Amino acid sequence: MLERRCRGPVAMGPAQPRLLSGPSQESPQTLEKEPQGLRSRGTAAAQSGGQALGRAHRCAHCRRHFPGWVALWLHARRCQARLPRPCPECGRRFRHAPFLALHCQVHAAATPDQGFACHLCGQSFRGWVALVLHLRAHSAAKRPIACPACERRFWRRKQLRAHSRRCHPPAPEARPFICGNCGRSFAQWDQLVTHKRVHVAEALEEAAAKALGPRPRGRPAVTAPRPGGDAVDRPFQCACCGKRFRHKPNLIAHRRVHTGERPHQCPECGKRFTNKPYLTSHRRIHTGEKPYPCTECGRRFRHKPNLLSHSKIHKRSEGSAQGGPQPPASAPERTPEPPPEPAPEPAEVPVGPGQPSAAAEAPPSLHTCADCGRGFRLERFLRAHQRQHGGERPFACAECGKHFGKKTHLVAHSRVHSGERPFACEECGRRFSQGSHLAAHRRDHAPERPFVCPDCGKAFRHKPYLAAHRRIHTGEKPYVCPECGKAFSQKSNLVSHRRIHTGERPYACPDCDRSFSQKSNLITHRKSHIRDGAFCCAICGQTFDDEGKLLAHQKKHDV
């Protein structure tokens, strides 16, 4: 649909895919006019008859589906390089000769200064974004989702729902669920349940006001003065549990614990939270963000309490190096030093008349592990940590029976069976089942290589790669075959070697019935099915008999 009108190669690269939205028909004309084999979300929805749109971006050449535009764009560059018929003008490649002939007609009628032209009306634009916006006027009738009440059509169902709420609200008889408190009606039962939480909060607020008694004019209600001099009053009390708060928004957020309301939802995995700070902290798992760095060793943490707990390890090690007295491991001593940074809101605890204020006491002591000295703020975190020392693994997988010491590890492992990959890379669209895998993958996009070998100076993006490389200098081979006693420096080499004893051949050729124990043998074998020069560089025309050689060659063109 987007054709760059020029005689010579396009400046951005002839094989560069151009992104475009809009449905089309399965004809040779429209198939080749779409940008570089990229199919839109609307096209997939219209042709699949309402199938799920999770992987609706489809390549027009190989029919593979992808979760996002970026992943499809990266795939299309490699997929198009395999097509056998290149355009002599711009280098774009096609699978069939009629498509190439149709494409060449565009160059025959083009002029160098017309830019991006609409193939329907001939109007030219300086940029492809302006052309995309213009094409929506032509493709209005192709939008797959139609409003049943008017003539408007939409690409996505959420656009239709927003339009229906704004322009076509349901009639009173179509809203059978009526609130008994205020008389407001709703079309769905879950909408009524969500609305009733407002009245529950109002009832709790009235009960709290009655429990606190009448307020003096001109000042908020306060409790009896507590010993401690500068203790701050907490006038807002929860009617259900009696917990007090200094500010009313904290009380409103606390009420959600009793009502069960969780209005803040994670857009990545759908998990819901009562407070927005909890959601912000949770989303760092998906993004891999660790905003709290340690000033001593550079290690980064997602949460500030974890950084404070980690910094105590450096303080203990400094005291040990200076010969200072160390507290016993079983009973840690409270230090009178103030916290590194004053918290904006101290811990909310029930305070009654005559009871000492928690703010006047020393900061809460950490629960310290007797084996390694690591401190934890909560006892349940300490118990989970101590399972690592004892070897206890109480959480078992229901699918394969594998045991884990932490429930979070079991949840992450269960994604192996379910196939769920909630962590997506923003650069290439690749998805991962664990946040740590995404964080390690992000280093592939970063140009820096922070892990340097002290022996030869070679740099690596990942620390395990450096550890495996250093075994070349040390000669260490820790992985021993139990069958023949042969040792290897890397575990992957041992796994590959053991297939000689087991006879396993997991790599099967898709073109014939042969299978191989090594992936390299399969790659070498597949060359016999591929004719010479099957992989052609779309920029300079050089041909290769292996896709890996083509990709390595394209790096010279900065593709």
Swiss-Prot record:
Single annotated GO MF: sequence-specific DNA binding
Zinc finger (C2H2-type): 57-81, 85-107, 116-138, 145-168, 177-199, 236-258, 264-286, 292-314, 367-389, 395-417, 423-445, 451-473, 479-501, 507-529, 535-557
Species whose genome carries this gene: Bos taurus
The name this protein goes by in its record: DNA-binding protein REPIN1
Subcellular location: Nucleus; Cytoplasm, Cytosol
InterPro entries: Znf_C2H2_sf, Znf_C2H2_type
Main localisation: nucleus
GO cellular component: chromosome; cytosol; nuclear membrane; nucleoplasm
UniProt modified residues of type N6-acetyllysine: 33, 276
Compositionally biased tracts (Pro residues): 337-347
Residue numbers of Phosphothreonine PTMs: 30
Residues with Phosphoserine modification: 27
GO biological process, one term: regulation of transcription by RNA polymerase II
UniProt KW keywords: Acetylation, Cytoplasm, DNA-binding, Metal-binding, Nucleus, Phosphoprotein, Repeat, Zinc, Zinc-finger
Subunit description: Homodimers and homomultimers. Found in a complex with RIP60 and RIP100.
